[in-house]
Amino acid sequence: MRPNARAINQPRPIKITRHYTKHAEGSVLVEFGETKVICTATVEDSVPRFLKGQGKGWVTAEYGMLPRSTHSRMQREAAKGKQGGRTMEIQRLIARSLRAMVDLEALGERAITLDCDVIQADGGTRTASITGACVALIDAINFLLKNGTLTTNPIKGLVAAISVGIVNGETVCDLEYVEDSIAETDMNVVMMEDGRMIEVQGTAEGEPFSHAELLTLLDLAKQGCEQLFVAQRVALAE
């Protein structure tokens, strides 16, 4: 039986709280069960050097975990003097995922940075970050539309992400830490709301998985993301 007696296709309770901080153009607290991430969107009227003069914008992301977001304290990466490989991999994934939902030409020569700070980790921090940052990004775009900086909405659609895996021989959706730590297969799937996939990251931690299991996992991810899109729409309507 899964933790909290969840069905195999049932994500953890999802909560998205908008306007969570005071200063950012978009800010969200996203909760996937006990995993909690603050996502803020910052708009700047400049782009990276490689994009200057091209009339296109940019969306990027940074990711980090508070020292006591986990069971035991982690040293801050700033204290170490460099980011770890896992951190860089995750923030690149978040940035790629969010760029897929934006028409960069319609954004114009400005950049939006999404900062995703994990305040409590219980599995799925990268998927929660993407799902919450999507809403923060839309709020930042709406800020630009409302003040007249933008006249055309560059948002192509919602983006959400969820983990799926095989635990004790059973395919399951939205793994929390106790499941993730013993999973035979772990996979993260990022999707647009029209069903197209942005990224699939899958690894056999124990037993290799079959083609049939892969298709089952992708179907579970689609079902899970559809529930996340509902949560995003509800939050954006508030």
From Swiss-Prot:
The entry's keywords: Nucleotidyltransferase, RNA-binding, rRNA processing, Transferase, tRNA processing, tRNA-binding
Organism name: Histophilus somni (strain 129Pt) (Haemophilus somnus)
Residues involved in phosphate binding: R86, G124, T125, R126
Role description: Phosphorolytic 3'-5' exoribonuclease that plays an important role in tRNA 3'-end maturation. Removes nucleotide residues following the 3'-CCA terminus of tRNAs; can also add nucleotides to the ends of RNA molecules by using nucleoside diphosphates as substrates, but this may not be physiologically important. Probably plays a role in initiation of 16S rRNA degradation (leading to ribosome degradation) during starvation.
UniProt GO molecular function: 3'-5'-RNA exonuclease activity; tRNA binding; tRNA nucleotidyltransferase activity
GO biological process: rRNA catabolic process; rRNA processing; tRNA processing
Catalyzed reactions: tRNA(n+1) + phosphate = tRNA(n) + a ribonucleoside 5'-diphosphate
Enzyme Commission designation: 2.7.7.56
Gene name for this UniProt entry: rph
Family: Belongs to the RNase PH family.
Top EC category: transferase
Gene3D superfamilies, alphabetized: GHMP Kinase, N-terminal domain
Protein's name in the database: Ribonuclease PH
Classification via CDD domains: RNase_PH_bact
Residues passing through the membrane, by range: none
Subunit structure: Homohexameric ring arranged as a trimer of dimers.
